[in-house]
Amino acid sequence: MERIWLKNYPPGVPHDVDPNQYSSLTDLMETAFRDHADNPFSVCMERWMTFRELDALSRAMGAWLQDQGLEPGSRVAIMLPNLPQFAVTMCAILRAGYTCVNVNPLYTARELQHQLKDSGATSIVILENFAATLQEVIEQTAIRHVVLASIGDLLGPWHGRWMTFAVRHLAKMVPEFELPLDGGRTVTSFKKVIAQGRQMSLKPTVQTLDNIAFLQYTGGTTGLSKGAVLTHRNIVAAILQAEGWFTPALSSIGDLRKINSIAALPLYHIFALTLCLLAIRQGSHLTLVPNPRDFGKFIEVLKQRPFHMLPGVNTLFNALMQHPMFKTIDFSSLKLTQAGGMAASEGTARHWQSATGSAMIEGWGMSETCAIGTNNPVTQKHFSGNIGLPLPSIEIAIKDDDGQSLPVGSSGEICIRGPNVMTGYYNQPAENAKTFTADGFMRTGDIGIMDTEGFTRIAVSYTHLTLPTKRIV
């Protein structure tokens, strides 16, 4: 198909990306650990972690996981907020040859049970604050190994110990729990896992771009939560697509390793996860915000040092602007405000740009596409109200109910094809048959219109279908 949108790409944005430059996502990680060892990777509550530390910690945890006798490709669940433990755990799982299953820490017992049972996860790394929820359902799942993290595990010996004490005993944010140990089930503290893993060796694993990296759960286009099967190829492609698209906004920084991105969106969310992995590739760093709903503390974090990229959702931007301390934030270094998760309103975007000097750039994507789909050019000077152009190596087609492509300017279902698009829903053959068209496009359930310049907008109303937008980027 003709890619009419390419003519509107900003200078420097590639038309295509090549995931084959890496043999796997873990190859990308190993390269980053080698090339950026002494660079900072993240900061959380003023505790820094370098790439060298991320390498060592994830290597230790990966070795420990292997020592539990897990089969290659086993699913390991992660139920953590934006703490340093998240990246360590994610990298450990992948380096050990397993599959990550991201879990929303605020899930109810019913939601948690469904996801653990559907994925077949045999292990879980969970913050102790949420262990009481796990206790309710663990007997109905295949979980055999529980790694129990505390908030202060990676925040330094003194500050970390104090934070854990404060959360447990002062704020009383850790409900009482008792995880059953029958049937050989193990419960091990995060710190003990790292200590034991340091005495072990991480065994090399043979992984390809076609191995499964993540089961990313989503409502899908309809029905119950489903696991989108995201391969190493899908994730590597998404990283390269995001990097290519964002570069025009960030290139003025010079050394991309100096980029400071604010990670306020939860890392179990596919867009934040992709940006975390982009930071690993680039050697840049993340400022982790464990609880962005505490806007006072969030603003204090934003005031601590210059930041260059701020992804968020409409409600987050609105709440920030309404806070009395908002005007004390220095936005002079902000190069990119990336909006998604829900439709950004023109009023919010106009107010944000007036207050910060940064245009709000809106995009669209899904868990099924690694959060990558369309995005407005990052060189855009003002909010557009549409969802932008397809990113490198992505094709967007507007199709009718029979899967036939419609002429430019017609309203129909937005369908997407590209190396970042999932291979299907986990153990859902009937759903997969309905989700993909004969020519390999994925039906998104969103209704839109593409204009002659290649820009797409979500249709406000459509007479044949009434479906919620899956916009998440």
Q: Could you say what each language-model-derived stretch is?
A:
Residues 20-21, 38-83, 87-91, 108-113:
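Conserved AMP-binding/adenylate-forming core of the ANL superfamily
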Residues 23, 389, 404-409, 413-465:
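Conserved ATP-binding/catalytic segment of the ANL
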Residues 55-60, 193-200, 228-253, 317-318:
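Conserved structural elements of the adenylate-forming
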Residues 67-68, 95-192:
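Structural core segment of the AMP-binding/adenylate-forming
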Residues 162, 304-312, 321-382, 395:
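Gly/Ser/Thr-rich phosphate-binding loop
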Residues 174, 178-217, 224, 249-260:
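Conserved pre-ATP/AMP-binding loop-to-beta segment of ANL
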Residues 218, 463-469:
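Conserved small/polar residues in nucleotide/adenosyl-binding loops
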Residues 236-260, 268-308, 323:
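Conserved AMP-binding/adenylation subdomain of ANL enzymes
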